Amino acid sequence: NNFFHYLLLDNLLLVDIYNRAKKLHVEVTAPRAVFLIETRLEKDNIVTELLKGMFSSQGGDYITAVDETNVILIKTLDQAVTYENLCDVARTIVAMMNAEAMLNVRVAFGTVVQELKDVSKSYKEAKLALDVGKIFYAERNVVAYSTLGIGRLIYQLPVNLCRIFIEEIFGDNLPIDLDEETLTTINKFFDNNLNVSETSRQLFVHRNTL
């Protein structure tokens, strides 16, 4: 467990990764993705236990944690894995936590990596997906790094740059309190990656009105 903890946090030298993986009989080369399960409460052991019942180290899957609210699944995958396969894993976790423990969890996952040393990259992507998802896709309980779209770009902009942009656009009339209709429109706009035509179609309004 400590090995994967340090691996995710980039606290191991490359030679140490290979040496410890050999001792622990962990495959160095295999397609893997990191799934981050947020319990929204302080981490409960039941989440870890349920995950251990669903995924086993014999199948190349490993469960660990790096903080108090998130549990991490490092899942070994087939070479022909697809984005939809990853979504199925995430949706299964959400459904199981809800059915077995009545827990409302959010699951984020990173991209597939082929080398053990790159697992930390998938973890960082999953963590970013979780953070961005809370802001731009709050209604989703499954968030993929590869589908963050414009939300990821905006999230990574410096705060000062965002503040200057807002002041230039709105002047003194900052939109602090937005009505529900406006918020719905904005969220739908982001959902469609700023595609005006598709957003106006889904909201049943003319594109000029939008």
Regions found by a protein language model. Give the residues of each.
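Cytosolic nucleotide-utilizing catalytic cores of signal-transduction proteins
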Residues: 2, 6-209
